[in-house]
Amino acid sequence: MFTLGIICWLFDRTLDLIEKRIAKVFTGKKEALAAPNILALNAGYNFADTIEAFSSRYTVSKVNLPPGEYRRITGNEATALGFLTASQLSKLPLFYASYPITPASDILHELSKLRHFGVKTVQAEDEISAIGMAIGAAYGGSLGLTGTSGPGVALKAEAIGLAVMAELPVVIANVQRGGPSTGLPTKTEQSDLLQVVYGRNGECPVIVVAPATPGECFDMAIEAFRLAIKYMTPVFFLSDGYLANGSEPWRIPDPDKLPTFEVTFPTGENGFIQPYSRDAETQARPWIIPGKAGLEHQIGGLEKENITGKVSYDQENHELMTRLRVDKVAGAVQSIPDMSVHGDEKGDLLVLGWGGTLGAIRHAVDNARSKGFSVSCAHLRYLNPFPGNLGDVLTNFEQVLVPELNLGQLLMMIRAKYLVGAIGLNKVQGQPFRTSEVENKIYEMLDKPVRKVAGA
């Protein structure tokens, strides 16, 4: 408390709110502890005020946030709450299996505290067991979920292909870290993008979503399950170590305003349903859980015959089914929102990012715009498929800059798909971007004589 008092003086903060908090925490049998803690807090404040050892004080202006009830939340905490909320909204039990791995382990820790909501968690003996359990849970009608980091994704790859072939709604949370191999377990990176989009044998498409802030982890965790169920396909939730361990003030949502998503299982009461028949809108197959009389069907990793789901080695059927799976994932674009542009919708330069780079990018763009530069930014939350308007957004700007904590993986994808001459700003040091790094690159690309920015 003494140290906290010093910090409050340094940052020009009054003590009244902290004193009220202390009084609230130390109630009942602990009430006697409140007074000495408040005294220690004030002693630290007065010590800093009188010792004349500090040459500077700092004033942090009050943040401008919408009204509501807020709490501090980390990315992994928000991720766990988001997956729990998806369970509540869908009225399906959540099953989470994972092998401990930094920086994803906190998701297991948080979900294991939520058993009173019906959450089931398993600390598996290895990565392959964890994804196998999640697939089995999805097959049985639960929300099947597993979590890991890049090395674990490599081990899970074959089983993820099984989920694609069986067309089951499994969600895989990948909290990225520095790689390859063991790499930098406690440092952040964005080097798993190509791995999660393409890293399996065969034509093996999956949906990929990525939060941009710790608080957004909550929303995108729900979105991952919404898309997985709607399209009956595996979905990657792609976070990173910076988001996982970073925190921010998070407005607690009103549960009554969260959109529900209905889940129905065929019962066989209306006759036999072909296991690989397709929904006209989404091309998803029905979610048939085992134990329903009359709905028995084959399941597994061998190619399935269209409609019937029987094992098939027919060459034309294989191409048909391959294209159906690819088109189904590509068609998910109709269920994701268009991306928005921060700033003008046309101009000299667009800074395009994804994941935890949002803060540095937006601050850099705002700084440049305040100096009169024609620059805007956009941030991707959907990485496969891309938002439907991404191509139009890119062509509205003379130049495109793509900052990434890798050696240009999103850059490669948008160059290939949209044929734009984008430029990368790449960093693989285990650290997030500084605002100054992005800002100086903006001035360099706009070829303007601006003094180089230093600092954060």
Q: For each of these PLM feature ranges, what is it?
A:
Residues 73-82, 90, 220, 225-456:
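Flexible, low-complexity linker and terminal segments
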Residues 1-26, 408-409, 433:
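Short alpha-helices
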Residues 3-5, 94-97, 144-147, 207-210, ...:
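Short glycine-rich or small-residue beta-strand-to-loop segments that form or flank ligand, phosphate
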Residues 21-24, 36-39, 43, 219, ...:
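A non-catalytic, amphipathic alpha-helix used as a structural packing/dimerization or gating element
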Residues 4-7, 151-152, 176-178, 356-357, ...:
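Short glycine-rich anion-binding loops that position phosphate/pyrophosphate groups of nucleotides
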Residues 105-107, 156, 181-182, 219, ...:
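Short helix/loop capping segments that flank catalytic or ligand/cofactor-binding pockets
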Residues 17-206, 210-211, 428, 436-439, ...:
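Thiamine diphosphate
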